[in-house]
């Protein structure tokens, strides 16, 4: 029996990673399905395989609860670009997954139901998008076909979202003539999914994709840097070996390249024996691409989500770091009370979370209050691949309580040196 040959991925236009973010039930998955349907039917340079709502929201527990838990990946093309799109979860309990999804975005489509306006999760997703490096956001105000809405209400919703985005450091373009925001689109994802030829239906998808093409800037890809990819998932393929998937953060990889698997466990050396993108072979994976990489001789159980694949010797695992953090206020969804030296939250680096202990500066306050901005020393339970500049989120009990950036790796510092700078509080053993 002949083996079916893999298709070759055709890289014929600029590539961008994008995704939907926003509050639960505001229509992110419906919009994602509507985009694929529009691109599959429109012609004129638009291309996609239609993905129905149920196909995107595909795990049984997701459909039963009516919410998206894990991130789903789809692809489509406009006349200008090729998009890899992640549909991010919106439920507060699954912000951990949202962080993973948002880490794979160059830009985002913020979905806001016009009937509700900006909600708590809307605000947290905007904040998280900024923290994980999403460069640009366009807005889709959904459910604009509702009889509950009038022009005045929609203008209020638009104004609120605009203020929210600007306050988090996102720029929104303004029309010079009428002051409107062309990156804020009104529509109905359901009307579009049902194929309605109207301004709120398919017309809104056309406008949305045009706004993505125009206002979400193509990022500068770190193609020339040392290869680095966070491992999001690991699969075992019978007869071929182990495949790891993720977004290439920098550099390039091709068949035959030697790589290291770094973080959490002992560093392992292996070789790339294949690169795929959307189940199609690619000659070379480049920074910004979501890929699957086949590894020679690596066992499924020896590799895990949260490790990184990298050029040998280019990045190393660490447990001790000095970081600058900002803590969230109660209004932003953070802690209601402060914390002291010895605080033990979860730290999220790229695609992994690890427990760590946060210690406060010796010359600082005794307690960190919500909204504070300061330097801390962190000691992680497990070594994580990181370097100066790496970003992370801080979570506790299902709530994002802060975010930070690595200022210095401190593994080489002695306990005495660290104790001169930070209030080291050790647990007393009985």
Swiss-Prot record:
The keyword Cell membrane does not apply. Residues 66-70 are annotated as: G2. Mg(2+) binds at residue 29. Gene3D superfamilies: P-loop containing nucleotide triphosphate hydrolases, Translation factors. Residues 87-90 are annotated as: G3. It is found in: Cytoplasm. It comes from the Bacteria. One of its GO terms (cellular component) is cytoplasm. Its EC number is 3.6.5.3. Residues 142-145 are annotated as: G4. Residues 22-29 are annotated as: G1. Monomer. NCBIfam families: EF-Tu (TIGR00485), PRK00049.1 (NF000766), PRK12735.1 (NF009372), PRK12736.1 (NF009373). This is Elongation factor Tu.
């Amino acid at each position: 029996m002949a083996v079916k040959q893999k298709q070759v991925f055709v890289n014929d236009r600029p590539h961008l990673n994008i995704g939907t973010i926003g509050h639960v039930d505001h229509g992110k998955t419906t919009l994602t399905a509507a985009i694929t349907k529009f691109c599959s039917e429109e012609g004129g340079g638009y291309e996609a395989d239609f993905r129905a709502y149920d196909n995107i929201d595909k795990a049984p527990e997701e459909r039963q609860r009516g919410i998206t838990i894990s991130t789903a990946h789809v692809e489509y093309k406009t006349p200008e670009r090729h998009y890899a799109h992640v549909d991010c979860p919106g439920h507060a309990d699954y912000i951990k997954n949202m962080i993973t999804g948002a880490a794979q975005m160059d830009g985002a489509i913020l979905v806001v139901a016009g009937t509700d306006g900006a909600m708590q999760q809307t605000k947290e997703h905007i904040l998280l998008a900024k923290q994980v490096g999403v460069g640009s956001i366009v807005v889709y105000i959904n459910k604009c076909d509702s009889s509950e809405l009038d022009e005045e209400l929609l203008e209020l919703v638009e104004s609120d979202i605009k203020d929210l985005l600007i306050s988090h450091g996102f720029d929104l373009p303004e029309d010079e003539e009428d002051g409107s925001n062309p990156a804020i689109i009104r529509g109905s994802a359901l009307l579009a999914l049902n194929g309605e030829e109207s301004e709120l239906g398919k017309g809104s998808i056309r406008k949305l994709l045009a706004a993505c093409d125009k206002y979400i800037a193509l990022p500068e890809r770190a193609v020339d840097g040392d290869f680095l990819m966070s491992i999001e998932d690991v699969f075992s393929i019978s007869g071929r070996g182990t495949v790891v998937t993720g977004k290439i953060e920098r550099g390039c990889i091709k068949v035959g390249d030697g790589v290291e698997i770094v973080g959490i466990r002992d560093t392992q050396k292996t070789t790339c024996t294949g690169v795929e993108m959307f189940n199609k072979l690619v000659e070379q994976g480049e920074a910004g691409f979501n890929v699957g990489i086949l590894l020679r001789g690596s066992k499924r159980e020896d590799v895990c989500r949260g490790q990184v694949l990298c050029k040998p010797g280019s990045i190393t695992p660490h447990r001790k770091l000095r970081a600058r953090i900002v803590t969230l206020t109660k209004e932003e969804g953070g802690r209601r009370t402060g914390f002291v030296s010895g605080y033990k939250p979860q730290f999220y680096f790229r695609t992994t979370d690890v427990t760590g202990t946060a210690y406060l500066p010796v010359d600082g306050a005794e307690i960190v209050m919500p909204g504070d901005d300061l330097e801390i020393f962190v000691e992680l339970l497990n070594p994580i691949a990181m370097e100066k500049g790496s970003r992370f989120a801080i979570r506790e009990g299902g709530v994002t309580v802060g975010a930070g950036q690595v200022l210095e790796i401190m593994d080489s510092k002695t306990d005495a040196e660290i104790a001169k700078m930070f209030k080291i509080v050790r647990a007393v053993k009985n």
